[in-house]
Swiss-Prot record:
This is Potassium-transporting ATPase potassium-binding subunit. The chain crosses the membrane at residues 2-22, 60-80, 130-150, 173-193, 246-266, 278-298, 374-394, 412-432, 483-503, 525-545. It comes from Bacillus cereus (strain 03BB102). GO terms for cellular component: plasma membrane. Part of the high-affinity ATP-driven potassium transport (or Kdp) system, which catalyzes the hydrolysis of ATP coupled with the electrogenic transport of potassium into the cytoplasm. This subunit binds the extracellular potassium ions and delivers the ions to the membrane domain of KdpB through an intramembrane tunnel.
Length: 555
């Protein structure tokens, strides 16, 4: 029965992807029906804020994005610092320590939601609502806006205006869908209140303080925007965030909704729907491979315990919630790292070595399917690399969407693809070379190395999940992961926008018999191979020293 539920869940991922992709294309490219519904409200926003609806250059678009995001980081930073004297603080929580506030503000603006604090004890209701939830809308709206400009550039059209796209992302996508999802979560038992904690009497007569809050509205945008941060420290293992299997499936659907839709949006916007389908199917195959790998490993149980003859019919149940079970915990772990959300319904630090390898690889690749917007930019980056390699092998100038890929584009892409592992491996090496980093490790040996690398991989990929055995709420970890999150977020977005702007100016080369097609299964295979090979070449030595070595040791 459990496998039937898994298949149905997978089918739901597939069935909603194309309709959502079509809706996104209409929402941003203009639709009379949508303009009639949302247009008056949007024009009012533009009038109040002084936004002019004109086409920007890629530099203007990128500058607008960085300045708006930077302003939001500063505002939210001071909310966190001053929350102790601000209203909506029934628990009288004090202001955040400076480096923690720095880390948290960047974390949520970068759509990472790395949390070096426990949500219910670290933030007031005001900080949760005005700080965290606000950024949970703004962060994915930023990247969804940028990916639309990116696709327009690839299609040879004007990039558009960042502030217009940002507003439309909020009004036409995130606010309405999150509102509906929040109502469903309330119906499923997720609390939504501004009242303080409830004191309950337990069976043995003791008193227990039960924390609550505006959780349902928080969870809806947490998953839809691929944010992932928890209202509670236990994240989606907490029964108030994720009461049962229905809420569990809904959360996974929300996580996958926009990332899986974007290939279809892209196909419609560039006039090649088949290429969009090829990208979707290719990535889904990689996703399935990851799910099969982690599930097989978790169902086989812990190798060390198996050697003692201990029964493991339920698989490795350490760190998992009984109400979700091993299979759906494995699926959730695959989804949350494939869609770069970072929400967890099981503790990733307790996964088996190979089970923990899958989330790590998903984040290292950062392209299956990746988070809202940012992940799709990486998908196209790998697609262009696949075309470039294919062109070199047959001695032709590589072309993508009928435009020649030349030195300028490849230099930008080369720098972008190297920057991600440089952040992960460079900062991991720094942490391992000083006691400021190693003192946080709770496990010696290979697993301790994986804890460190996982933290920086999660930060660079804007995922936010963690091997929580790492004691990371220290100035060193707050500052270094904050820098990694900021650089990992904005560097690739800006460089790839420059690539799209460069391709926009090029003329379309007529298709000939020798043109390498990017809308067939051959390209899909080369595309997958490029992702796997580039990822393996870059990160394989670290994976051998971490989870693979741990697995062999336990065996």
């Amino acid at each position: 029965m459990i496998w039937v539920a898994v298949v149905i869940t997978m089918l739901l991922f597939i069935l909603v992807a194309k309709p959502t992709g079509i809706y996104l294309e209409k929402a941003f490219q203009g639709s009379k029906k949508l303009d009639k519904v949302f247009g008056p409200f949007e024009k009012l926003i533009f009038k109040i804020t002084g936004v002019k609806e004109y086409n920007q250059t890629w530099k203007q678009y990128a500058l607008s994005l960085v300045l708006l995001n930077g302003f939001m980081i500063v505002v939210v930073y001071f909310i966190f610092r001053l929350q102790g004297v601000l209203p909506l603080n029934p628990a009288h929580i004090e202001g955040m320590e400076p480096t923690l506030a720095f880390n948290t503000a960047i974390s949520f603006m970068a759509d990472t939601n790395l949390q070096h604090y426990s949500g219910e004890n670290g933030l007031s209701y005001l900080s949760q609502l005005i700080g965290i939830t606000f950024l949970m809308f703004a962060a994915p709206a930023t990247t969804l806006a940028l990916v639309m400009a990116f696709i327009r550039g690839l299609a040879g059209k004007e990039l558009g205006n960042f502030f217009v796209d940002f507003t439309r992302a909020l009004t036409r996508v995130f606010l309405p869908i999150a509102f509906i999802a929040a109502l469903v979560f309330v119906a499923l038992g997720v609390p939504q209140t501004l009242d303080g904690a409830v004191t309950a009497q337990t069976i043995d007569g003791a008193k227990q303080s039960i924390l609550r809050g505006p959780v349902a509205s928080f969870i809806s945008i947490k998953e839809l925007g691929n944010n992932g941060g928890g209202f509670f420290g236990a994240n989606s293992t907490h029964p108030f965030e994720n009461p049962g299997q229905m809420s569990n499936i809904l959360q996974m659907m929300l996580m996958m909704l926009l990332p899986t839709a974007l290939p279809f949006t892209y196909g419609r916007m560039v006039g090649n729907k088949k290429q969009g389908r090829i990208l979707f199917v290719s990535l889904f195959m990689v996703f399935l491979l990851g799910f099969i790998t982690i599930t097989t490993s978790e169902l086989h149980g812990n190798p060390a315990l198996n050697g003692m003859g201990i029964e493991h019919v339920q698989g490795s149940t350490e760190g998992k919630e009984v109400r979700f079970g091993t299979v759906f915990s494995s699926l959730y772990a695959t989804v949350t790292t494939a869609a770069e959300t970072g929400a967890v319904n099981t503790m990733h630090d307790t996964l088996t070595p190979i089970g923990g390898l899958v989330p790590l690889v998903n984040m290292m690749l950062n392209t299956v399917y990746g988070g809202v917007g940012a992940g799709f930019v990486n998908i196209i980056m790998y697609a262009i690399i696949a075309v470039f390699i294919s062109g070199l092998m047959v001695g032709r100038t590589p072309e993508f969407l009928g435009k020649k890929i030349e030195g300028k584009e490849m230099k930008l892409i080369a720098v972008t693809i190297l920057f991600h592992p440089l952040l992960i491996l460079g900062f991991s090496a720094l942490a391992l070379s000083t006691s400021l980093g190693t003192d946080a490790i709770s496990h010696s040996g290979f697993h301790g190395l994986t804890q460190v690398v996982y933290e920086y991989t999660s930060s660079a990929a804007n995922n936010g999940s963690g091997f929580e055995g790492l004691a990371d709420n220290t100035p060193f970890w707050n500052i270094t992961t904050g820098l990694v999150m900021f650089l990992g977020r904005y560097f690739s977005l800006i460089t790839m926008l420059a690539v799209a702007a460069s391709l926009k100016e090029k003329t379309v080369v007529p298709e000939t018999v020798g043109t390498f097609r990017t809308d067939n299964s051959l390209f899909g295979g080369i595309f997958i191979g490029t992702i796997v090979i580039v990822g393996a070449l870059t990160f394989f030595p670290m994976l051998v020293l971490g989870p693979i070595a741990e697995f062999l040791t336990l065996k």
